[in-house]
Amino acid sequence: MANCAVLDWQGKEAGKASLNLKVAKDSSAVDLMHRAVLRQQAHSRQGTASTLTRAEVRGGGRKPYKQKGTGRARQGSIRTPLRPGGGIIFGPKPRQYNLSMNRKERRLALRTALMARFNDVIAVKDFGSKLKVPKTKEIQDFLARLDISSNSKVLIILSQPSDIIRRSVRNLEKVKLIAAEHLNVFDLLNANSLIIGEDALGKIKEVYGDD
């Protein structure tokens, strides 16, 4: 079980929160999280790079000049890979980079990553409830009250982020806002600071606590 402080919007302590999730064994935890990150990054690749082979590149099949008597190296086609504008040898073609991972392993990797970072978590009660209009300065001031550097990568996890909060954080380059249902291993491990809404913490317990 791991514990963290619950703070209000002013940065004052408003209670305690705890989380107890099943995690991977120490001997396999790093490998499991590593495979989960590789899978996530592989799935984000488009795989649309494509080049033309000598059979596909535009141009005639006529021999550019005679075989002998020119003093030059022999050439059989203007589409040969040896000439500028010719085909590409072993160039990339559209492909899928997706990696497979069992659902049970994916969930275990996510729980392991979350528990590993839980000591760095700051739970916030009623996050952004006082924001009536989108205001980036309010978010910046809030992070400053938590002693979070402007250069730190911050992950904010809420159960259902409102449009006001989304618009308030979208201009902050180092701040990423996600819904609790979109929680993932890469974002958890990549962030320097983790902020979780108190209601999002309940959602995480509900979704990931029964395995």
From Swiss-Prot:
Q: Which GO terms describe its molecular function?
A: rRNA binding; structural constituent of ribosome
Subunit structure and binding partners: Part of the 50S ribosomal subunit.
| Family named by the database record | Belongs to the universal ribosomal protein uL4 family.
**Top-level lineage group:** Bacteria
Of the GO CC terms on this record, one is: ribonucleoprotein complex
Keyword RNA-binding (UniProt): yes
Protein name per Swiss-Prot or TrEMBL: Large ribosomal subunit protein uL4
Which Gene Ontology biological process is one annotated for this entry? translation
Q: Where is the composition biased (Polar residues)?
A: 41-53
Instruction: Please give the function described in this protein's UniProt entry.
Output: One of the primary rRNA binding proteins, this protein initially binds near the 5'-end of the 23S rRNA. It is important during the early stages of 50S assembly. It makes multiple contacts with different domains of the 23S rRNA in the assembled 50S subunit and ribosome.
Identify the SUPFAM superfamilies for this entry.
Answer: Ribosomal protein L4 (SSF52166)
Keyword entries, A-Z: Ribonucleoprotein, Ribosomal protein, RNA-binding, rRNA-binding
Q: Which cysteines are joined by disulfide bonds?
A: none
Q: Organism source for this protein? A: Prochlorococcus marinus (strain SARG / CCMP1375 / SS120)
Which residue ranges does the record annotate as region Disordered?
Answer: 41-85
Secretion signal span: none
Q: Does the keyword Ribosomal protein apply?
A: yes
* Biased composition range(s): Basic residues: 60-71
